[in-house]
From Swiss-Prot:
UniProt entry keywords in alphabetical sequence: Membrane, mRNA transport, Nuclear pore complex, Nucleus, Protein transport, Translocation, Transmembrane, Transmembrane helix, Transport
Protein name: Nucleoporin ndc-1
Transmembrane region(s): 80-100, 123-143, 160-180, 191-211, 256-276, 278-298
Pfam families per record: Ndc1_Nup (PF09531)
GO biological process: mRNA transport; nuclear pore organization; protein transport
Record topology, Perinuclear space segments: 101-122, 181-190, 277
Cited InterPro entries: Nucleoporin_prot_Ndc1/Nup
Organism for this UniProt entry: Caenorhabditis elegans
Cytoplasmic side: 1-79, 144-159, 212-255, 299-588
Gene disruption: observed consequences: Embryonic lethality ranges from 40% to 100%. One-cell stage embryos show shorter lengths with decreased pronuclei diameter resulting in decreased embryo nuclear size. Nascent nuclear envelopes in the non-core regions are more continuous and contain fewer holes that may contain nascent nuclear pore complexes following initiation of furrow ingression. Two- and four-cell stage embryos contain half the normal density of nuclear pore complexes.
Polar residues: compositionally biased ranges: 1-12
Amino acid sequence: MMGDSHSSFTTTTDEHLYNQFSPGRRKNDFPAASSSSSSPNLRRSPNRTVSSPRVQQKPITIFDQIVDWFQAEISVRKRLAGAACGYLSTIFFIVTVSILKLTIWAPFSSVQDSLAWWIYPNAWASIIFVGIASVAMSLFSIIKFCKVDQLPRLAATDTFALAGVALEFVTRLTFVYTAFCVADFSFSREFAFVAISLAIAISSALVVFRSDYQLNFSHIQVNSVKTLIDFGTSLPYANISEICGIDAAISYTAAVALILVVGPMVSGFSAWWLLLNIPFHVVLFGLCFTQQFYSKISMKIVNQIVMKPISFPFPPPYTVHSPTPEQTRTLPNVIETDDSLLKFFALHDLRTIAWNDEKRRVDVFSLSQPGKHPRNWKAVSLPCVRMLDELCSRMTVSAARLVGYSWDDHDIENEDVPRDALLMPRKMREMAYRGTGQSRQQKSMAPIRSHNTQTVGLLSKISNFLGFGVTEKLVISRFDAHMNAYAAEALYMLVVDSMGEDRFGVVQKDLKDLITLLCKLIAAIDTYERAKASVADKSDVTFLRIVDASLKSSLQRVVTTFGSHLSSLNLPEEHSRTIRMICLTDEL
């Protein structure tokens, strides 16, 4: 995880300042032996012996307590999301049965029956049964699949994914069969139900393997009736319906093909009469479409409940000798934890502070008492700087490997090349010391070890899709891209806000370093994208554009805010050139 390692690319002075100003880290700097040796759990007693004197219990830090509290909170939210999805599935069940009860042969009585059937107690057992089964299936999907660092698609070889397909199929088949029985529908007793079962099986596989289970924050947070209405109206129903229609058409086509090919062998040629049964086609396509639509809407509900933002306070300017568990859950402590989901919440909260919360920004720009140190600013800025600096270094190293300047190429160098010439550029060195012998010519013509996958065949693509192929490790994942985007937007928006709100100048002291890091990272991403242009797999380039957009918008805001004052920073010419190129300004 980026930002978790303390041996990152920041200077020793910054690390020392961070350890000095972070109260949570200061508590954890003592050796483990001193705390464990004084613990009563490790003292010898007449009734208890210690098996090994070298075994010491790891002390529980405030970071462990924060993570335990957060995991308990997320567990409660996931159960609540599962119950909400089960409630939504119950509503879908009631609507499905009501539609199945409609018939043109008895319009008035069927309409009355479809509207009031669920009120009678004899129908409650089926409704409760479907609701419980839906809650169980939703909880399994949320716990096993819904993660903040989840891939866009699950691999076909994933055991839990295959189990999820089986559970989704059983749950949905139970849903459909119960609806047919309650509505007294004829398709539950013929070969039609076999075709419907096949369509549901394929639709279940599409639900699991083509759904995006990544946990992410919603743009609209539901906390009132008005925000609930806004959230409902903001959903892209046209896009969702198009995707659901395509997946439903795949399942529908498979069921029709089954009737054409297998139907005569199982039920005789009478099975072909289903092809002329219009209600059968409507029900078949409608069941597949509602299954896909329910899966998309339920994921929106899960993100709305599980990913509800948490507001973390800042520590007071004075030292608290015996803080309560609530007082230890401060933003500087939370942003330093190892839990990826908790750090994601912390960076989102920091971004919210930088953009919308003027009252809490006062704490960021405040000084500690006594001492008057910018403790809060250092505590929230250094993790963001480490994260962005690590990404910059990875971009630089990966770009060098793509163009062939890596340590793997040293084994093809000629042994007769002088040692001093190794500092020369590669092409210049080859031109100066290329020999006429066949061995030297073969070595100079050796291919560069790059990861060019442009000639990947059809079988390789199929194996990669099914999860059997060996895929290249991405330089940055989608989760890391969102993390770095949040860090950049929070950090540099605080720089912009400091122009009018930083009374003590705690941010202006780091302004040159922050702008330098911003320009270096933009240049590193641009170099990597150019080196990646000839490679077929551009997944990480797509994710990098998320970070690149945040960095460029941040640079434009900083330059617009400070304007001509940036000339006093004496930035290097390459960084000034980057600023002029992106911001289209001549002030530097």
